[in-house]
UniProtKB/Swiss-Prot annotation:
Gene Ontology CC entries for this record: chloroplast; chloroplast envelope; chloroplast inner membrane; cytosol; plasmodesma; Ycf2/FtsHi complex
Main location: plastid
Positions of ATP binding: 824-831
Recorded GO MF terms: ATP binding; ATP hydrolysis activity; ATP-dependent peptidase activity; chloroplast protein-transporting ATPase activity; metalloendopeptidase activity
Bilayer topology annotation: Multi-pass membrane protein
GO biological process, one term: chloroplast organization
Knockout or disruption consequences: Embryo defective.
Keywords from the UniProt entry: ATP-binding, Chloroplast, Hydrolase, Membrane, Nucleotide-binding, Plastid, Protease, Transit peptide, Transmembrane, Transmembrane helix
InterPro entries to which the protein is assigned, alphabetical: AAA+_ATPase, ATPase_AAA_core, P-loop_NTPase, Peptidase_M41, Peptidase_M41-like
Stored SMART domains: AAA
Gene that this sequence comes from: FTSHI5
Organism: Arabidopsis thaliana
Pfam families recorded: AAA, Peptidase_M41
Subunit structure as annotated in this protein's UniProt entry: Oligomer.
Protein name in UniProt: Probable inactive ATP-dependent zinc metalloprotease FTSHI 5, chloroplastic
Length: 1320
């Protein structure tokens, strides 16, 4: 199928009259990609079709199977009367016409083929603007022609035929960019633009070409991946069918031995179905291969090749235009200058002169011949006549130009016209050695030729006129149409004979060859059926239509003959434009022409191919087969000798038979063949074929099994460690506490070993400890700032006074402190307190570790260490001996009899002796820390020894406030410290330790900054300036008032200043344990978190919040939000219990508070009744209803707060049993509980009904924003006119006559059980 590509349209004489600057040679137009094309003819055109080998024949089946048929395809005979020029331009018409047909019938008969032919000819002859300049441009002429030709050549979009290839859109898109380049050239040529604009337009063409080429290749890669994936799936399915056929074959052999014919017939049918499916699969695989090859060929040969050609033509066009501008600038030299040509310029002018001489001498002779040359048809003759006419016009214009030149140049001197011989050193081979000189005095004039430029601008107009005239003549004159068709048919046969006459058979090479001169003619006449190109051998094989022979063409010879007309690349592009299937075999491409990505892919693919080749070599294949065979043999031996017998012993026979793991033993039993039985049978055959049952075999079996097990164990161990990490979920997790324990244990073992090594080396631990002795000047927390020691302040001052003046205690006869034990949990500040006491007393501290005092190389060394420690300390008194984790080496004595433990007890005894001896030597205090003082030996805790025990508890609220305030002064901006309500912060940090409280102020400030909206780009720009010039500003300048003022202004400008509202907002959002979060951070919800899903939860939360706001002096609602990340979403309310000024006094609950709590429990339940549609009630309020029943029961039975104010208490938690009472009295108690229960329900219902608008507004805003604060709730109540309750708030004062519900009294015994068993 032929088509005309928009990227390669040319004139009929494009191969003979192409411009010289297109002769770039085969090297310059070498494609940058490997191109592999294929003939895209139909599958019926192939001489051979693929045979699908029947499955039955492969596996030995004897039944009748479907066999794939081989179709015989032959070339159809084409009648001479039905052939027209080419596939695309051929007109099929019968050679005999009926003379009786009317004029209208004849016109109707020839209209359609003629219009089709004319359309194709018009498309073939119409130039495209993007390729007009490089295809037909010739050396320039003077500006006279430009002034006469003011008509602009209109751009006409080439409408491609329906049979065009799929990449024509990319070509059109690139041609649109090329049209911009051509317009730019025209503008610059008219001196209305700059030359740089041409370069920019060319760059735009290159960029667009790269973009389009990338799109084409990405589409190709995507299609290739999809098709190859489908092909792999089909291959796997085919392999599976083969495996199934093998299994059916084995079954048929078994059935054949048993004589079961019916089952044999069923197997035969199954095999037929499988064979049919197998054949279809391979047919589909062939189709996929064809599609893959077609897509690759089409993409690379058409899409990419056309884009590359367009880009190169544009580059040549720009080069030609630049030469034209240079030549114009050369002509514009002032008249006073003397023309002096260089040697290279003379050579170029001689080349142009020879070319123009040949054109002017040969073409007129050709046109004057009566018989047209065999290579020219009538169209070519008409074209030559037109060229002759243009040459005559050119000569006339040239004579006029010479006359005008004579008039202007007479003033320079006498006219001289003579022939000058070129010197031998400057002569160019192949050109005349003499040239004509035209001189006016000393001025030389060179007259250019005008025909080239005139032909260029008249080409398009001539095409349009010729096409219109031919079409009109064919439609009007029927006889002319018949004659035209007959001539075309005759011309086709004549063209084929001419081409065949240029072929011969080379007996030496045993091949048919074709003259390279005949190839362009055969291509232009569309006589070539297909072509194969081998660039590495520089040959081409062409096949003519209707002939099965391939003709050899020498590309090198062709390149030499047509070097000036584009060479072989021009021929290749013309073949693509004519739709000739051309396949380019793989060839060597220089690495310099490949991009980095292509070079990387080339290296990787080459390496992959090399490894595949090595893997398929005989040596590697034999080694691989040997190793796999050995592994299989070992597996079979282990399974037969160990695994299969164990399985048969453990699993009963009946169970194995049902699982398909055993063959039937009875005739009536049947079982299908399973993979297990197949594996067992193959393993048994393999095992029996190698088992010799001698000692040597068993010995080697044990050796092989041991080696195999060792390797397999380490492989699985490696995979267990590495595979999870590669998959992305890390190694198998163990208990972190156990891992931490082993690390700590290893550390202590290392320390103990290290101490023993030092002792062996003669290192004294006591000397080492005193070498580390230091005075504490700046403790972590000064003693005056310690907030949790108010109750122990007097004892601590006593210890400090003793250390400062030990003699004062001795003179007064007071008992001096001998040992101090600081007890507290981790993080309470035990070590900080010891250092603070040392700093306050201004005495040194000796830090002793437990491992340094323990037993060493001999028995009793620990006691000696203690004696030496205290002796040295007395010499250096006053001093503090500080021991951390005192319970590690001062534990309870008498639990063990081991020698090591006995030495430990001697260590404690010596420590007791030293503590008792303090009366003689003062100024030494043993200060130790521990978490559990009960683990220390009681003798050490008796009076007179370590009797000063400081218990560090969790700080109180006031102490936490002081700790927070002190930490804020150190870490926060001083201006922000007073903006925070530290009392409120201390209430929310109850469970935090002092060391954690110090981090809260910094977290508050950072969270406040995170909640602000900042301009990140502006902030980063300022930060970069600060980082660059901060070292230039001196420190004294920063401390000035002006610098501080400017800093504050800059902070305000960047929005970094924090206000009191920002800090209060952060404090309100603090979590109960001191963790600060900027609002509620939600994860991805587990369900679709829509408005319908959120509505029940929002109603539940809004009811709780509103009832809390309406009750006076009750708990405070701080936050209200919806949490979609919980199970199916959840509504949340954060309510803080009142601790002062309300209904709860301390830890005791008043009657008023319990009644308010009872009313509060009905808030969410009543809200759901009011806002949810009937029947959509849920169980979200069930826990609160249960809580209300519990409160009502406790008020009546335990507290005596019934509706009748009876003080009788009927149940106590510490009583042996409940108060005995009759059934009637129990009914009365149940009635009281129900009465107060219903009173609370009615009270809550009335409150919410009066504030229904407020409830709806809270629900609506909660659904919209998903979070509301206490301020938001107060605003909603105020804006919507909420009605709050006032004090006194009592349920017993409500007018109530009879209980609304008698649910407790409907049945006899159950109310008793419910009443007495109610949770309290």
């Amino acid at each position: 199928m032929d088509f005309i590509s928009a990227s390669s349209l040319s004139s009929p004489f494009s191969t003979q009259l192409s411009p010289i600057y297109l002769s770039s040679g085969i090297v310059s137009l070498k494609p940058r990609h490997r191109v592999k094309n294929r003939n895209f003819g139909s599958r019926e055109s192939n001489n051979k079709s693929r045979k699908i080998v029947p499955i039955r024949g492969c596996f030995g089946f004897s039944g009748s199977f479907l066999r794939s048929k081989q179709s015989d395809y032959g070339s159809e005979a084409v009648s001479e009367s039905l052939r027209l020029c080419g596939e695309g331009n051929e007109l099929v018409l019968s050679s005999e016409y009926n003379s009786a047909k009317t004029r209208e019938s004849v016109i109707q008969f020839v209209t359609k083929p003629l219009v089709y032919a004319l359309f194709c000819i018009a498309i073939g002859l119409s130039p495209i603007r993007s390729f007009q300049a490089p295809a037909l441009a010739v050396p320039f002429v003077s500006d006279v022609i430009w002034k006469k030709k003011k008509e602009r050549v209109r751009e006409k979009e080439v409408v491609l035929k329906a049979v065009d290839h799929e990449f024509s859109d990319y070509t059109r898109r690139l041609l649109e960019t090329v049209s911009v380049l051509l317009k730019t050239i025209e503008i610059v040529r008219k001196e209305n633009g700059e030359v740089a604009e041409v370069g920019a337009a060319l760059d735009a063409v290159k960029v667009e070409k790269e973009k389009l080429q990338k799109e084409i290749m990405s589409g190709l890669y995507r299609d290739m991946r999809r098709l190859r994936k489908e092909r792999d799936l089909l291959m796997k399915r085919a392999d599976k069918i083969v495996d199934e056929a093998l299994s059916l074959k084995k079954q048929s052999e078994k059935l054949l031995r048993k004589g079961a014919r019916e089952k044999m017939e069923k197997l035969e049918e199954s095999v037929d179905i499988m064979e049919s499916e197998y054949n279809k699969i391979w047919e589909r695989i062939d189709e996929i291969d064809d599609i893959i090859l077609k897509k690759e060929t089409t993409t690379l040969s058409f899409g990419v090749r056309e884009l590359i050609f367009i880009e190169r033509e544009c580059v040549e066009l720009v080069k030609s235009f630049n030469r034209e501008l240079n030549q114009k600038s050369f002509e514009s030299v002032p008249e006073s200058s003397i023309t002096k040509l260089s040697r290279s310029e003379i050579k170029q002018e001689l080349v142009n002169a020879q070319r123009k001489h040949l054109e002017q001498m040969i073409l007129p002779n050709v046109l004057e011949l009566e018989e047209v040359d065999p290579f020219f048809d009538r169209d070519s003759v008409d074209f030559s006549l037109r060229i002759k006419k243009r040459l005559e016009e050119s000569k006339k214009l040239q004579r006029d130009l010479q006359n005008r030149i004579r008039k202007r140049m007479k003033k320079f001197g006498e006219e001289k016209l003579f022939v000058q011989k070129t010197p031998e050193g400057e002569a160019v081979k192949g050109f005349p050695e003499a040239e004509v000189k035209w001189m006016f005095g000393e001025k030389e004039v060179v007259v250019p030729k005008a025909i080239q430029l005139h032909l260029r601008h008249g080409w398009k107009k001539w095409q349009e006129e010729a096409k219109a005239d031919l079409k009109q003549k064919l439609l009007e004159d029927v006889d002319f149409g018949k004659q035209y068709i007959a001539q075309r048919q005759e011309q086709v046969l004549l063209d084929r004979d001419r081409v065949v006459s240029k072929t011969w058979y080379n007996e030496d090479k045993s091949r048919w060859e074709m003259d390279p001169m005949a190839v362009p003619y055969a291509v232009s006449r569309k006589l070539i059926d297909s072509a194969r190109i081998r660039h590495d051998y520089a040959v081409m094989y062409v096949a003519l239509k209707g002939d099965d022979k391939e003709f050899y063409v020498d590309i090198k010879e062709y390149e030499m003959l047509f070097e000036k007309f584009g060479g072989f690349d021009a021929l290749y592009l013309k073949m693509l434009a004519c739709g000739i299937p051309t396949s380019v075999h793989l060839m060597w491409i220089p690495m310099s022409e490949l991009s980095l990505q292509q070079q990387f892919l080339l290296v990787t693919r080459v390496v992959s191919r090399v490894f595949n080749a090595l893997r398929k070599t005989q040596v590697v294949s034999n080694a691989k087969d040997t190793v796999l065979e050995k592994i299989r043999n070992i597996n079979d031996d282990i399974m037969m000798a160990v695994v299969f017998p164990v399985i048969e012993f453990i699993i009963p026979y009946q169970l194995r038979l049902r699982l398909g793991m055993a063959w039937p033993e009875e005739i009536e039993q049947t079982v299908g063949s399973t993979w297990y039985l197949q594996w067992q049978s193959e393993a048994e055959m393999n095992f029996k074929s190698r088992n010799t049952e001698d000692f040597q075999w068993f010995l080697w079996f044990l050796i092989r099994s041991s080696i195999y097990g060792f390797v397999l164990y380490h492989v699985f161990r490696f995979l267990k460690r590495k595979v999870p990490r590669l998959l992305g979920y890390g190694p198998f997790r163990r208990d972190p506490n156990v891992r931490k324990f082993w690390r700590v244990k290893s550390y202590f073992t290392y320390r103990k070993r290290r101490i023993k090594q030092k002792r062996k080396a003669g290192i004294d631990p006591i000397k080492t400890a005193f070498d580390r002795m230091k005075r504490v000047k700046n403790p972590p927390i000064p003693l005056k700032n310690f907030a949790s020691i108010e109750s122990m302040r007097e004892e601590i001052n006593e210890v400090v006074a003793f250390l400062q003046n030990p003699k004062a205690f001795q003179e007064m006869g007071a008992r001096a402190p001998r040992g101090v034990l600081i007890v507290g949990e981790r993080g309470t500040g035990k070590t900080s307190l010891a250092l603070a006491i040392a700093a306050e007393a201004r005495v040194p501290v000796v830090n002793v570790e437990a491992q340094e005092l323990e037993a060493g190389l001999w028995v009793g060394q620990s006691a000696a260490n203690v004696r030496e420690l205290f002796q040295t300390a007395r010499d250096l008194a006053p001093v503090i001996i500080f021991v951390e984790d005192f319970d590690l080496f001062a534990g309870v004595r008498g639990k063990f009899v081991h020698t090591k433990q006995q030495d430990h007890e001697s260590f404690i005894n010596q420590l007791l002796v030293e503590l008792d001896g303090f009366e003689k030597q003062d100024g030494v205090v043993l200060m130790a820390t521990t978490r559990n003082h009960k683990q220390i030996d009681e003798a050490l805790r008796r009076p007179g020894r370590m009797d000063r025990v400081f218990h560090l508890q969790s700080p109180t609220e006031m102490e936490r406030e002081r700790i927070l305030h002190n930490a804020a002064e150190e870490t926060m901006d001083r201006e922000l410290v007073d903006l925070v309500d530290w009392r409120k912060v201390s209430e929310k940090t109850t469970l935090l330790r002092p060391i954690e409280l110090k981090l809260v102020p910094m977290a508050l400030e950072s969270s406040a900054f995170r909640s602000k909206f900042l301009d990140t780009d502006e902030l980063l720009s300022y930060v970069s300036w600060f980082a660059t010039f901060s070292h230039i500003v001196p420190p004294w300048l920063r401390k000035t008032k002006v610098a501080k003022t400017m800093g504050k202004m800059l902070v305000n400008h960047l929005g970094l200043n924090l206000t009191k509202d920002d800090l209060e907002n952060v404090v309100d959002l603090m979590e109960p344990y001191g963790q600060i979060s900027n609002g509620i951070e939600l994860l991805n919800p587990t369900v679709d978190w829509t408005r319908e899903t959120k509505f029940p939860h929002a109603v539940w939360a809004a009811g709780r919040a509103l009832i809390t706001l309406l009750i006076p002096n009750f708990d405070v609602v701080e936050n209200l939000w919806l949490e979609p990340s919980s199970w199916e979403g959840i509504g949340c309310t954060k309510i803080t219990k009142v601790t002062s000024g309300g209904s709860a006094i301390g830890n005791t609950e008043s009657r008023s508070y319990l009644e308010k709590k009872l009313v509060f429990c009905f808030g969410s339940h009543i809200a759901s009744q009011m806002l949810l549609p009937p029947g959509d009630e849920n169980f979200l309020s069930s826990s609160e209803i249960t809580k209300a029943q519990e409160i009502a029961t406790r008020m009546v039975l335990q507290y005596g707060w019934g509706p009748d104010d009876s003080p009788a208490v009927y149940y106590a938690t510490n009583a042996v049993s409940a108060l005995s009472m009759g059934n009637n009295h129990e009914y009365e108690m149940a009635g009281k509980v129900e009465k107060i229960y219903d009173l609370a329900y009615e009270k809550a219902k009335g409150m919410l009904l009066k504030n229904r608008r407020v409830l709806e507004k809270i629900t609506e805003e909660l659904l919209e924003f998903e979070i509301l604060t206490h301020k938001d709730l107060e605003r909603i109540v105020h804006e919507n006119g909420g009605i709050r309750e006032k004090e006194p708030f009592f349920l017993s004062g409500t007018n109530y006559n009879e209980a609304l519900s008698r649910s407790f009294l409907d049945v006899g015994d159950p109310p008793e059980t419910a009443l007495l068993s109610a949770p309290t």
